[in-house]
């Protein structure tokens, strides 16, 4: 099979041919139709995770996937050949990934792709949608909250804007002007502030009584936390710590997205019904996947998705 790989320490991401691994009991072989790019893939490709996660070379990049069941291992009764499924690879080691033609997944982590939802959209939800869900839960957002979403036009941020608005909170989103501002407004942001031009003054104008919560998906956590009222909350998907936030009167929660079938299934159902918009910024072919890794850090409106077949 073809896969987006890192051959060894210091190697650049490249599409390579790999053997398909043996299908174990309890596993499902999925013919992958689409996968998406997340920050963990870019960090792995850049070598930032060498000392943080075990690496089993060649590392196949990618966490999110959607496709069709090809075959099932012994003891699997929930799935059959031809079923449309999606999943998130949750292993704490880097090795088996999702940006490839075939994934052998534990049957218990898969969810059904609802009728009417494309594989591209199902794959785009994945880890970013789960991270946004976990951020909202960490903050416990309600209609009484005024929340700033930083990095609102990226994958996690775009889902977080929608979920925060659905929770009833007033959402202030950071985005550059023009298309990015229109994009986050369409997702449910009540106000948009340009993080490149006097962020504090813009936020104070949009929320004169101060912010009660911050979703930190980008930017300086201390700068964002300074805009919170005393007793406010900051949830960070990029690992901000209380020391980095620098305020003892603010609750800081680092969020590590935990993908479960229940969370993913709920997100896919919401996407299929139209209650959740799946923001796909660009779609790449598998042979263009290394470029998607390179493009991840550039400004974009939503997720980067790889069409496998």
Where do the protein language model's features map onto the residues?
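Glycine-rich beta-strand-centered segment in the early N-terminal region that forms part
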Residues: 21-36, 49-91
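Glycine-rich phosphate-binding loop and adjacent beta-alpha segment
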Residues: 218-279, 308-309
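Short amphipathic alpha-helix with an adjacent loop that forms part of the alpha/beta core around
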Residues: 198-209
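NAD(P)H dinucleotide-binding glycine-rich loop of Rossmann-like/cofactor-binding domains
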Residues: 31, 78, 88-151
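C-terminal hydrophobic helical "lid"/dimerization subdomain
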Residues: 1, 264-309
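Mid-domain Rossmann-like dinucleotide-binding core that forms the NAD(H)/NADP(H) cofactor-binding site
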Residues: 123-197
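Conserved beta-strand positions in the Rossmann-like core of class I SAM-dependent methyltransferases
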Residues: 70, 172, 235
């Amino acid at each position: 099979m073809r896969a987006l790989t890192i051959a060894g320490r210091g190697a650049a991401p490249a599409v390579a041919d790999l053997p398909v691994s043996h299908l174990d009991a309890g596993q499902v072989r999925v013919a992958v139709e689409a996968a998406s790019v997340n920050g963990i893939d870019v960090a792995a490709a850049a070598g930032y995770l060498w000392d943080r996660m075990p690496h089993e070379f060649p590392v196949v990049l990618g966490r999110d996937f959607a496709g069709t069941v090809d075959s099932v291992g012994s003891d699997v009764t929930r799935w059959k050949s031809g079923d449309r499924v999606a999943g998130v690879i949750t292993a704490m080691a880097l090795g088996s990934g999702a940006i490839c033609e075939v994934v052998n997944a534990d049957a218990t982590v898969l969810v059904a792709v609802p009728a009417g939802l494309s594989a591209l959209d199902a794959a785009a939800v994945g880890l970013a949608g789960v991270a946004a869900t976990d951020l909202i839960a960490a903050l416990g957002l309600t209609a009484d909250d005024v929340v700033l979403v930083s990095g609102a036009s990226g994958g996690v941020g775009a889902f977080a804007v929608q979920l925060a608005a659905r929770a009833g909170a007033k959402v202030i989103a950071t985005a550059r002007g023009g298309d990015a501002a229109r994009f986050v407004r369409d997702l449910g942001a009540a106000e948009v502030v340009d993080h490149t031009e006097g962020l504090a003054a813009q936020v104070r104008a949009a929320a004169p009584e101060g912010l009660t919560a911050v979703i930190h998906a980008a930017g300086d956590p201390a700068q964002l936390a300074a805009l919170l009222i005393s007793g406010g909350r900051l949830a960070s998907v990029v690992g901000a710590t209380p020391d980095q936030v620098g305020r003892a009167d603010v609750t800081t929660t680092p969020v590590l997205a935990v993908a479960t079938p229940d969370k993913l299934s709920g997100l896919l159902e919401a996407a299929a019904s139209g209650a959740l918009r799946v923001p796909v910024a660009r779609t790449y072919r598998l042979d263009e996947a290394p470029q998607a890794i390179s493009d991840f850090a550039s400004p974009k409106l939503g997720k980067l998705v790889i069409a496998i077949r």
